């Protein structure tokens, strides 16, 4: 996706039409990409190169809609500076608005992942969350099998409102707090086991980890400690606005992860981007 002609500002002479410039840029980009693909050992026999002008995320999403793509892959190299922090990179915009799964590939990650981490959340146990967890587990299991590697299934849990219980006049005793934590862990562990039992046909073998901590922190720390090659995670925090996935765990993981991330959309997700 080319950014367009904004960078040329008012430098176009009257005898040069914008379309002429677009044609020149398109031909140059097309040749550069095709030359790169020819020299690549991984180039496919059937491959189509398309050049688009406009905002990268929007044009990518419109191509997904037009050609019914099942997956978008993008490198984890994006913009920097204040603008990127305020408005989000192309990767984050794809996570929020793209209708199909999005794979953000870390430059140093292996092409075929051998250590795959599936981040699930069994609570609340609804049909919607079950379907999303099933998609996560199916995808992660397939990726691990392709590489002949290992599948880790992780659920991070925490006691809601714990900080309110430990400070101020109404704080409870350490003993009571510890018992509440123990009960919370028991419930989360049971719900996670129940989920995996319901989905036995989905995964062949996996290493289960139920870890105390907030979702983003547990996923990132586990992936770094265990040297995961790929994190498979769901984007479930949909706002009242159609297609807007704001503040989700997946988004936070993509922003901070040093590992490739594959973000799975929930069933019924509708992108706010209009097709061409």
Tell what function each PLM region has.
Residues 73-76, 102-107, 261-265:
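Short beta-strand elements of ligand-binding domains
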Residues 3, 19-23, 27, 31, ...:
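Structural beta-alpha unit
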Residues 1-17, 115-174, 205, 256, ...:
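Small/aliphatic-rich secondary-structure junction motif
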Residues 89-110:
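Short, structured interface segments
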Residues 48-52, 103, 152-154, 193, ...:
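General small-molecule cofactor/ligand-binding pocket signal
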Residues 17-31, 125, 174-190:
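A short acidic, glycine-rich active-site loop
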Residues 74-93, 230-255, 270:
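Glycine-rich, Arg-bearing micro-motifs that act as flexible, cationic patches
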């Amino acid at each position: 996706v080319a950014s367009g002609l904004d960078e040329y500002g008012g430098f176009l002479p009257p005898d040069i039409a914008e379309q002429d410039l677009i044609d020149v840029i398109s031909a140059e980009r097309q040749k550069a990409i095709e030359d790169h693909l020819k020299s690549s050992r991984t180039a496919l026999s059937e491959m189509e190169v398309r050049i688009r002008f406009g905002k990268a995320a929007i044009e990518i999403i419109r191509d997904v809609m037009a050609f019914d793509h099942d997956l978008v892959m993008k490198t984890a190299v994006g913009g920097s500076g204040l603008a990127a922090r305020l408005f989000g990179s192309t990767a984050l915009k794809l996570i929020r608005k793209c209708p199909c799964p999005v794979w953000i590939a870390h430059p140093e990650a292996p092409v075929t992942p051998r250590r795959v981490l599936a981040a699930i959340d069994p609570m609340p146990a609804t049909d919607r969350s079950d379907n999303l967890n099933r998609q996560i587990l199916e995808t992660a299991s397939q990726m691990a099998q392709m590489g002949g590697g290992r599948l880790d299934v992780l659920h991070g849990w925490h006691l809601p409102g714990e900080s309110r219980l430990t400070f101020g006049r109404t704080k409870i005793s350490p003993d009571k707090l510890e018992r509440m934590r123990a009960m919370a862990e028991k419930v989360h562990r049971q719900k996670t086991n129940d989920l995996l039992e319901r989905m036995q046909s989905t995964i062949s073998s996996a290493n289960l980890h139920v870890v105390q901590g907030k979702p983003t922190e547990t996923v990132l720390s586990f992936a770094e400690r265990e040297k995961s090659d790929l994190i498979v995670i769901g984007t479930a925090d949909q706002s009242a606005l159609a297609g807007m996935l704001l503040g989700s765990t997946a988004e936070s993981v993509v922003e901070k992860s040093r590992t490739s991330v594959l973000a799975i959309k929930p069933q019924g997700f509708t992108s706010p981007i209009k097709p061409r």
